[in-house]
Amino acid sequence: QDYKKAFEWYEKAANQGLIEAQNNLGNMYYFGQGVKQDYKKAKEYFGKACDGGNQIACINYKKLNPWGY
């Protein structure tokens, strides 16, 4: 699996407002797949996807709250 290439494509799609890509990018930041692990960035992208109606992203967003992100 080429996580770096996947990250590039998800980032392009997320920046164009694709909700699933925003959630996937959040996951990549959360797990450090293809990019340095960054919980703040993960929460940012989960928040965007949640605002777009992705319920899984909303759950992921809320999971980061107790950690102070």
For each feature predicted by the language model, list its residue ranges.
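Glycine-centered coil turns and helix-coil junctions that link the paired helices
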Residues: G17, Y29-V35, G53, G68
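Hydrophobic face of amphipathic alpha-helices that form TPR/SEL1-like repeat modules
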Residues: N24-F31, N60-G68
